[in-house]
């Protein structure tokens, strides 16, 4: 797999999980002889929701909730076959979404 690049994008609601997963991926890739660029923190996406506190009156009284989606991006330059096999066998936590582009 010469002159190729693997781009890995991680998404999670908990920043501790995403940092731990990124560290595992970087460690695995470096151990198998690949060059890793990143992890680069991408902007956190914040979704806010306004909910009425009362079912009947008091329209001005509201609760605000938010969901924060943290993202990390990393590139693996010139991956070897061992790198790809090791990344496929890697077990990441359930709360982390992984997108891989070759």
Curated annotation (Swiss-Prot):
GO terms for biological process: translation. Keywords: Ribonucleoprotein, Ribosomal protein. One of its GO terms (molecular function) is tRNA binding. PROSITE patterns: RIBOSOMAL_S10. GO terms for cellular component: ribonucleoprotein complex; ribosome. Gene3D superfamilies: Ribosomal protein S10 domain (3.30.70.600). SUPFAM superfamilies: Ribosomal protein S10 (SSF54999). NCBIfam families: PRK00596.1, rpsJ_bact. Part of the 30S ribosomal subunit. Belongs to the universal ribosomal protein uS10 family. Involved in the binding of tRNA to the ribosomes. This is Small ribosomal subunit protein uS10. It comes from Cupriavidus necator (strain ATCC 17699 / DSM 428 / KCTC 22496 / NCIMB 10442 / H16 / Stanier 337) (Ralstonia eutropha). The gene is rpsJ.
